[in-house]
Structure formats: structure tokens, C-alpha cells
């Protein structure tokens, strides 16, 4: 899980979602997991 000031899609399978007021990226590739904060 990467924590970044700006999250973006790294591939076409990445999905941007909001959980508990946090913007997150979920993907089949675990290296692409990101959280904004």
C-alpha cells in the first residue's frame, strides 16, 4: 500500500474508490494499491 498526496490509475484495471473519506486505488496487481493521505 503506497500512501501518496495524489493517487492515479497505474493500469487499466485500477479502480479509484472512496472509503471512510479516503481516496484509494484497488487493483489486481498488489503493487498498484494506493491511498491518499
From Swiss-Prot:
The keyword Ribonucleoprotein applies. The keyword Chaperone does not apply. One of its GO terms (biological process) is translation. It comes from the Eukaryota. Pfam families: Ribosomal_L36. It is found in: Plastid, Chloroplast. Keywords: Chloroplast, Plastid, Ribonucleoprotein, Ribosomal protein. GO terms for cellular component: chloroplast; ribonucleoprotein complex; ribosome. Its main location: plastid. InterPro entries: Ribosomal_bL36 (IPR000473), Ribosomal_bL36_sp (IPR035977). Signal peptide: none annotated. One of its GO terms (molecular function) is structural constituent of ribosome. HAMAP family: Ribosomal_bL36 (MF_00251). Belongs to the bacterial ribosomal protein bL36 family. This is Large ribosomal subunit protein bL36c. It comes from Porphyra purpurea (Red seaweed). The gene is rpl36.
